[in-house]
């Protein structure tokens, strides 16, 4: 029989790291034409769940999800059909559920969730605070041009601090009194010469970094009483803050910035490069060359990998730890237009989300490059930003003047189980 063409059987071992779903560790003979659907039926038959409810699994064959026939997958990987094949199965991540639509007066270009709050920034120059249940709490004015990025500095029951950046060439530090529901601009951060597209707060909340169309990366104090070195008395009294550090190296706009740890920053740029900066040395530690302008980049502390969003509809995976930094680990196909935003899950090692100009959000597993796990639909215009900081909620903002909130069923169930 011609197994490679789907005829005949393949010897497989079925493995799982979820011990309560383990099946006997013996070789099984299965048809080469099997797909995920047939493998699900086969494993569930072996398990014979006591409550009778089937479990949805995904199947990893040589570190990549099976998305077609097993024989085609093996052929693509140049794996011998004569060898016993190990197949790892994992419980499928449940589909996030649409929960809410938060309507604004203009494009929503920045979103960031924290606890029960959602912070948004808009093209009408305003910031807004919402509950994750969809209640509007506060509109904040101060910027004089569209807001491009926001991030929380600290948050407790009584107060919150956050930073926003704008096309008005500034970043602003804000203090929010939860009880009185009032927000005050503590400092206006000046130093960039063009719009400020990206902002990120350090893990300890003491500093934040900004990336701008002026190609500069700047690091600022996030402390309330620290206006920056060299700041004149007059500027301090007026609430103006200057940067602690300015780093030069990109040739075009810095579209993404993220703290990798307390002394390391990641930036992505329209100049087709990713750069890893060592702040203790005030210089570039690693540079990764890509073949497209980078619109967004996200680093995972769980797997140490970087995923990027670009102008060619694709997402790409990189490892900054290797000497072959320019080599793409994987390319993810699924969007039909520019991918504007991307972010790793903060709790799920292999999962990330993306938002694009095709009006769609997608939830991905980095081991499934051929297709996303789920399409998260709802936006009527292009997606401008996406956030998964709160494990329970995927939040996105778009040119349809709305924020879409999707609830992660797995995170909600896990939080209930720990109570």
Curated annotation (Swiss-Prot):
Coiled coil: none
Any one Gene Ontology cellular component term annotated for this protein: preribosome, large subunit precursor
Superkingdom of origin organism: Eukaryota
Predominant place of localization: nucleus
Repeat (WD) residue spans along the chain: 103-141, 142-184, 191-230, 249-287, 289-328, 334-374, 378-416
Keyword flag Magnesium: no
Family per record: Belongs to the WD repeat WDR12/YTM1 family.
Protein's UniProt name: Ribosome biogenesis protein WDR12 homolog
């Amino acid at each position: 029989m011609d197994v490679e063409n789907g005829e005949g059987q393949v010897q497989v071992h079925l493995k799982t790291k979820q011990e309560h779903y383990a099946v006997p560790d013996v070789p099984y003979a299965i048809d080469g034409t099997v797909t995920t659907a047939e493998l699900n039926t086969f494993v569930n038959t072996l398990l014979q769940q006591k409550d009778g409810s089937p479990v949805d699994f995904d199947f990893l064959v040589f570190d990549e999800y099976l998305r077609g026939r097993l024989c085609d997958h093996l052929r693509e990987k140049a794996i011998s059909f004569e060898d016993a094949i190990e197949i790892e199965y994992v419980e499928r991540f449940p589909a996030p559920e649409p929960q809410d639509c938060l309507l604004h007066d203009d494009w929503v270009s920045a979103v960031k969730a924290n606890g029960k709050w959602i912070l948004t920034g808009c093209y009408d120059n305003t910031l807004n605070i919402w509950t994750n249940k969809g209640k509007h709490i506060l509109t904040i004015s101060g910027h004089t041009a569209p807001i491009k990025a926001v991030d929380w500095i600290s948050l407790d029951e009584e107060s919150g601090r956050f930073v926003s950046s704008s096309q008005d060439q500034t970043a602003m530090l804000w203090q929010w009194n939860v009880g009185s529901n009032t927000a005050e601009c503590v400092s206006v951060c000046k130093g960039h010469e063009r719009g400020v597209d990206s902002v990120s707060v350090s893990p300890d909340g003491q500093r934040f970094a900004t990336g701008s169309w002026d190609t500069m990366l700047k690091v600022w104090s996030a402390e309330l009483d620290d206006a920056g070195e060299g700041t004149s008395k007059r500027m301090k009294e007026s609430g103006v803050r200057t940067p602690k550090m300015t780093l030069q190296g990109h040739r075009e706009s810095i579209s993404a910035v993220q703290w990798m740890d307390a002394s390391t920053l990641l930036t992505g740029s329209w100049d087709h490069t990713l750069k890893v900066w060592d702040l203790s040395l005030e210089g570039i530690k690693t540079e990764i060359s890509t073949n497209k302008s980078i619109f967004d980049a996200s680093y995972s502390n769980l797997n140490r990998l970087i995923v990027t969003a670009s102008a060619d509809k694709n997402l790409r995976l990189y490892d900054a730890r290797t000497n072959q930094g320019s080599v793409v680990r994987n390319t993810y196909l699924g969007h039909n237009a520019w991918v504007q935003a991307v972010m790793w899950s903060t709790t799920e090692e292999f999962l990330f989300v993306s938002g694009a100009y095709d009006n769609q959000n997608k939830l991905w597993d980095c081991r499934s490059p051929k297709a996303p796990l789920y399409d998260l639909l709802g936006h009527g215009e292009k997606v401008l930003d996406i956030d998964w900081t709160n494990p329970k909620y995927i939040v996105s903002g778009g040119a349809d003047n709305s924020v879409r909130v999707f609830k992660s069923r797995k995170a909600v169930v896990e939080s209930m189980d720990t109570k």
